[in-house]
Amino acid sequence: MAKNKDIFQLGGKAYRVYPLKAPWGQVRLILKVESYLDGTLAVMAFDVSGRHPEEYAVLTVNLCNPLQDEEKAFFDTNNCGYLYGQLRQAGVIHPLPVSARSGFCTYPLCEWDKTKFVPEQER
């Protein structure tokens, strides 16, 4: 881990650390760009509070919607709704006036600012 508590090194790459509130306490998350099999954006969160990073959650859901692409994805408000407002306030997500239903849940489409996943000096 880097000496700066706001930066975490993983696989030779620097990631910005977001101290966020979960229902059970504080977590320190980094966000990583991945993709679904159809090539659309998937965002993984890893908890770096401990000695080793642990997979925390997939923050997006793949609804096979034509509005999804490499920049826009539906936020998983069903499992990670408590992070939605915090990431919005941090400027990581920008909600769009579109949502989609799956089962009993409605998911907002967001534009993800992937530049916020890395420290400012790495952009």
What residue spans do the PLM features occupy?
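Intrinsic disorder/low-complexity detector
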Residues: 6-8, 67, 78, 115
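Acidic, aromatic-enriched beta-alpha/helix-loop junctions
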Residues: 44-92
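Short, compact, well-ordered microdomains
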Residues: 76-122
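Low-complexity, intrinsically disordered extramembrane tails and loops of integral membrane proteins
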Residues: 2, 122-123
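Elongated scaffolding segments in large macromolecular assemblies
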Residues: 2-5, 12
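A generic structural micro-environment signature
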Residues: 26, 67-69, 99, 118
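Catalytic phosphate/metal-binding cores of nucleic-acid and nucleotide-processing enzymes, i.e., regions
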Residues: 10-15, 19-24, 28-58, 66
